Design a protein with these regions (language model features):
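Compact beta-sheet-dominated domain cores in extracellular/mature segments
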Residues: 2-4, 8-203
Length: 203
């Protein structure tokens, strides 16, 4: 178990996984065999989005945060997900417009059309969790509801957060549970947060 301070969010400890829109298919070039301990092999975060449904038309691949989609702004109709990705209806992850829509999904070569209300709506996007391994333990705290706006994340225990009392939504990745605390140095009220099943994220 790991720890962190939170509750109004100040320290943290982690502890294991919840889920959302998941699909597990085999990638063509990366083995997803489980290791000797039964855990999934590392899976690089990567998102390929298309200008038409059914993964047709012009496409663009993302492996990092994209606060602006530039020439692909308001053009995404479908995507293939490797990892855990959030797409936002406004630039900079809806940080300046928390009324804008967003959409998140995850999986291993999981391809899907955007919901009808989100077709041609995405203006920014980012992954959550570790960039080189969607199955690695992490806690990702967002300063608005529904994983919008600025964030703070941790892969290990943290007796004090950089941004006190800011988290309004959280995603947990990996298999470890996390304990969040009201005050620094693991003091005050606490709560445990679990990831999803089988190494998938908890929202």
């Amino acid at each position: 178990m790991q720890s962190l301070s939170l509750l109004p969010l100040i320290s943290l400890v982690y502890t294991s996984p919840l889920q959302l829109d998941i699909a597990t298919q085999r990638r063509t070039k990366l083995s997803l065999e489980t290791d000797e301990e039964g855990t999934k092999s590392a899976l690089q975060q990567r998102l390929v989005c298309y200008e038409r449904t059914g993964q047709y038309g012009e496409s663009y691949a993302y492996t990092d945060y994209a606060p602006f989609l530039n020439q692909f702004d308001n053009r995404i109709q479908s995507c293939c997900f490797d990892g855990i990705w959030i797409l936002y209806g406004d630039v900079q992850y809806n940080g300046g417009n928390t009324m804008a829509h967003n959409f998140w999904a995850y999986g291993e070569n999981y391809c899907t059309d955007m919901p009808s209300s989100f077709i041609n709506q995405a203006s920014s996007l980012r992954y959550t969790g570790h960039p080189s391994d969607m199955y690695r333990d992490s806690i990702n705290m967002y300063f608005n509801e529904y994983f919008m706006g600025e964030e703070e994340f941790a892969y290990n225990d943290a007796p004090q957060l950089n941004y006190d009392n800011r988290a309004q939504s959280i995603i947990v990745t990996g298999r470890q549970w996390w304990t969040i605390y009201q005050y620094p140095n693991y003091q005050g009220y606490s709560a445990c947060l679990a990831p999803g099943n089988n190494g998938f994220p908890g929202f």
